[in-house]
Amino acid sequence: MAHRAVSRSALSRSIAVVLAAAVLGMPAVALADTAKEQELEARVAELEKLVKQLLAEKQAAPSPAPAPAPAPAAVAAAPAKPDAKPIQVATITPNAAPGTSFVFTGYAKVDGMWSDASDGELTESNAARDFYVPGGTPVGGLDEGSPDFDAHAKQTRIILGADTVLEGGDKLQTRFEFDFYGSSLGDQRVTNTYAPVLRHAYVQWRNWLVGQTWSNFQDPAVLVDSVDYIGATDGTVFVRQPQVRYTLGGFSLSVENPETTLTPYHGGTGGNQRITTDDSSLPDLTARYTWKGAWGHFSVAALARELKYQTTGTGAIDDSTWSAAGSLSGKFNLGKSDDIRYMLLAGNLGRYVGLNFVNDAVLDASGNLETIDGVAGYVAWRHVWSPKWRTNLYYAMQDYDNKSSLTGGLVNKSSESFSGNIWYTPLPKLDIGAEFRHAVRELENGDDGTLDRLQLTTKYSF
């Protein structure tokens, strides 16, 4: 570029000199003597020679390469104007939800487990292959001789919500929660695809809650820190259902969706049949009071409900009865690193405990309902070894007073399980766990079966 500029400048000066000489010399041609003419001719010849030389050099010089176009990245990296707003913080729909903050959280969890049943096989469609179901432990079958392995990510959870601050300062809260224990859209052969399942969907304002969530008869604060989906399943209330709940301080009262499960007279077909009636006219009623402190918490709860069955046609049945149950539960802190969690239940527990291990009532020969009562509970110890390591040991049980003359001998009588786990947290929000369980299921006639399971898991919370 510099050489090209010099050549152009020299050429311009040369041409200017030639023209100036020609112009200045023209008026004096007639008067000029021979010497001056010769001098001018010599200068012109010299200038012509110089011009030819410069033109030759210009033609011989290589053409410079065109300047490269600016890279897209450089353009993208150019600083924005001072008044420009970043796209990611600009409101797409201004004032669409004033005073509202949104919630998106949950976790991804993958489980792998070896299950060894003493009296038969857990079939592929059995939910007991995904998590511990006390009523799913085989009884009276033949031992396969080797454990079965299963892996899935069905417990993965998604939680959505919105919190809106109203004009008066009150907060309106909504929550939606899903996991993937729904009906299979695929299978283990190809896609391992499973449908999302609605766990919670409720609206909360001041002291009121309306929607689907944990039953008020349940104390979710004392659930075990388990690798399994539930943990102390034999001895805990585990029910989510639609309800209207009122809470004032430590006291809460609710009306909840009713349902009745019955055992037919002498157990019906197969000796352990279940009838789901959906005939109740009144909601289930619950009440709870909870005391809290630095020491932990203690809670007492009661449940009252109508059990009802109606049929039409020949041998029609129309009967109902009331039943009740009670619960004591709590968590006691033993210093900074340990706590004890427990629950004790008694009365007509039915569908509320052990994933409906026993039914609410049994039909007699005349079609009347007779309630089935029992006791259940668990105790768990949790110890934190360090910020990265923690351990849980727990025992759970349930036992029922069946009227064997009505139920027959093939209905569930009792179950219990012993479990221990260890959790490792190598990174924030990342948990790796292992848990072993030994479980026993017994029928009313005394037959029993056992289940041993080793479960491994990886869980990332977000």
Give a label for each model feature:
Residues 31-123, 141:
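N-terminal periplasmic/intermembrane-space "pro-region" immediately following the signal or transit peptide
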Residues 424, 449-462:
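Outer-membrane beta-barrel "beta-signal"
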Residues 115, 181-186, 215-219, 224-230, ...:
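Sequence/structural signature of outer-membrane beta-barrel proteins
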Residues 2-31:
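Gram-negative bacterial Sec-dependent N-terminal signal peptides
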Residues 89-130, 134-264, 279-297, 331-335, ...:
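Outer membrane beta-barrel
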Residues 293-412, 416:
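Detector for outer-membrane/organellar transmembrane beta-barrel domains
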Residues 418-435:
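C-terminal closing repeat unit and adjoining cap/tail of repeat-based domains
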